[in-house]
């Protein structure tokens, strides 16, 4: 446990305070974040906003996980979409003995729209504005656990995302997504820019119930790209299975979704679970619940 904690503390010490987490949502976790391209509302709300373009429902999605299976690293998210607009919320914190040592919150507002469409092809675009807030918590104090420490303050930041997608015959998808293409951080102690990531996604649907996706993800300033591959297969109308692989680092993921349960003929519910391994740390487990009106 001390070894794991040391790794996390060292990684935090040498990284920017405002984090970049690509596996938000059960589907993204299960498919190793190979979700840049395709047609899925969860991916549109939390990732490439171009996938919001053809949405015509009201959807509410919420999820929770402890990163790497550690109780002191809780991650929660909520997303709401109506037509081609979406609102997303994410919170990740570090907690110890009931005290919050640090907390990061992200609020995003997104819109997707069609640039061009005909009988066979479609070109989509999406925009998202993100507002970030980071609370530094309190110092260790005389007790050493932060219970009576001094407030260390907070900081705010903002970022802008943009995504594009081309669709052919609703079977072939090519997408490009840039996160934090433009950003601003109050003050200068946290760095000049938010983490910027660029993703290229390819998806192919050989038939209606099977989705295969390939992503190439590049974090700005990192010379190595991440290659991600994901599969989603609908076994039956109410049950889907998902799996994925990633390189740099090597990770494996899988999960399922059980749903399309109609309640009072007003809305449908879906429950999903997924896990994602890590090359050093324990496995992350993700639970999500969605309601579609």
Language model features with spans:
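Sec-dependent N-terminal signal peptides
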Residues: 3-13
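Positively charged n-region of N-terminal signal peptides that target proteins for export
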Residues: 1-4, 117-119
